[in-house]
């Protein structure tokens, strides 16, 4: 188990382009100054019990992946550890995260075992769903990792996302945008009601929506204060609409390099491992997604 004073980052890799992008992102990410990294390479394909054989790369030994991974990470961490294990990838990553007491896990969006027609690899999905710490999922190699967008909704996981960002070391030029999306309350079948009642209900609904927006503004300012104290430049935004749609639109408008979401929102069921906004972000976001819990 890692010492509590350390911030351990675990990187899972299988040598795929997506995994190499995750390694590059891990080396660029603004982790705390005391961060250490450990990478794990699994010998087995996801769901297989025999040593891995990958289409098109059967002559690439696992030891070469270990060497390349260590070399890439050594640019930031000269003492980076890379472990080769005989386990399916998701199991290897989750086991290592528990053993090391990882503060964060970094994985590629889809590895060698995935099919091109699948939206997201089974390994990254399983890691995101079952890891006890935040998971950074990387689709392609980023050029910069300075602009963050964090979606908040009042949930415990959203607050944990803000706290996680406050632990990072803000990079030069680093900025964070905090966005809260309020789904407006509307009237259904109001046209069937008498005019006087319809007008009263509309005023009440308008007042309710205004109250919810005011609360959202207070919530984002509270989160912004926490990040400003940690050294981040912060902007806030409260939007009205469907949460995932507005979150992705804000990410595009702000040119975010990283999208940060809670694993499950305020309305998520406790038995659900991953909420709809987190799932949608992982599926549709072109930039790395950090799922916090």
Write out the residue ranges for each language-model feature:
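Gly/Ser-rich helix-loop-strand patches that form or flank binding pockets
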Residues: 1-7, 23, 28-32, 94-143, ...
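Small/aliphatic-rich secondary-structure junction motif
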Residues: 2-59, 76-80, 143-203, 226-230, ...
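Well-ordered alpha-helical segments embedded in enzymatic catalytic cores
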Residues: 22-25, 92, 161, 219, ...
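Short, surface-exposed alpha-helical segments at coil->helix boundaries
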Residues: 55, 59-70, 213-221
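Phosphate/nucleotide-donor binding subsite
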Residues: 67-79
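Charged docking surfaces used in two-component/phosphorelay signaling
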Residues: 84-92, 238-246
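A short, acidic, amphipathic alpha-helical segment used as a generic capping/interface helix at domain edges
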Residues: 221-225, 243-252
